[in-house]
Amino acid sequence: MKQSLLLSFVLLLLSSSSLVTPIHARNKSNPAKSPVGAPAPGPSSSDCSTVIYSMMDCLGYLGVGSNETKPEKSCCTGIETVLQYNPQCICAGLVSAGEMGIELNSTRALATPKACKLSIAPPHCGIITSGATTPGASPVSPSAGAPTTSPSAAKSPETSATSPSSDETPSMTAPSPSSSGTNILSVPALTIVFVIVSSVAYISAFSN
């Protein structure tokens, strides 16, 4: 009778301890999600360097003040090569030409695919700077607005560079889910072992 009572009591304790196990399993099955990657930026002039020189034959047609009425066949072939690689490389080519001091008619450059009767649509380059201009437009000097810079505007990069919010936030990490599951199991397990040992000692002393 006493042995059966002891066995029933031990089985009851073991069954109650099994209720804690799913909590640990649920905590362990929820790993931290990886952050979503930022979208890739558009192609730069260095990415388009393999095809950007295909437009060299178009310089005579695209130059500011050019008298040519239509692009040459070699120019159309080069434009088609650039469009097949990446249409945005035309924009990169206009910017690169401006950086080298070559003034091009950006409006005519974007209309060249249509003039060459190509089926690929030209890109939307927006406002082209760095020397690529339309007829009658003069390039804007980058130093023109320098004297109007206020002292507060000059100090703003230093203030943003010393801000701790953007640099220190990524270093904060959330606690591992597995460690919380271990803490949940440790206290009930020790309690069960203590109760079992105490019960066996009590029943053994009572039977003697």
From Swiss-Prot:
What Gene Ontology terms for biological process does this UniProt record contain? lipid transport
- Region labeled Disordered — which residues? 136-181
- Which cysteines does the record link by disulfide bonds? C48-C91, C58-C75, C76-C116, C89-C125
Cite the entry's keywords alphabetically: Cell membrane, Disulfide bond, Glycoprotein, GPI-anchor, Lipoprotein, Membrane, Signal
The protein's topology relative to the membrane is:
Lipid-anchor; GPI-anchor
Q: According to the record, which residues are glycosylated?
A: N27, N67, N105
Q: In which tissues is it expressed?
A: Confined to the anthers and stamen of the inflorescence, especially in pollen.
Q: Which GO terms describe its molecular function?
A: lipid binding
Provide the residue ranges of the propeptide in this protein: 180-208
Q: Where is the lipid attached (GPI-anchor amidated serine)?
A: S179
| Mutant lacking the gene: phenotype | Some early aborted shrunken and deformed seeds, with abnormal hair-like outgrowths, and infertile ovules, and increased salt permeability in seeds associated with an increase in unsubstituted fatty acids but a decrease in omega-hydroxy fatty acids in seed coats.
Give a yes or no for keyword Signal in this entry.
Answer: yes
Signal peptide interval: 1-25
- Localization, UniProt: Cell membrane
User: PANTHER family, per this entry?
Assistant: BIFUNCTIONAL INHIBITOR/LIPID-TRANSFER PROTEIN/SEED STORAGE 2S ALBUMIN SUPERFAMILY PROTEIN-RELATED
Q: What does this protein do?
A: Lipid transfer protein involved in seed and ovule maturation and development, probably by regulating the fatty acids homeostasis during suberin and sporopollenin biosynthesis or deposition.
Instruction: From the Swiss-Prot or TrEMBL record, give the protein name.
Output: Non-specific lipid transfer protein GPI-anchored 4
Native source species: Arabidopsis thaliana (Mouse-ear cress)
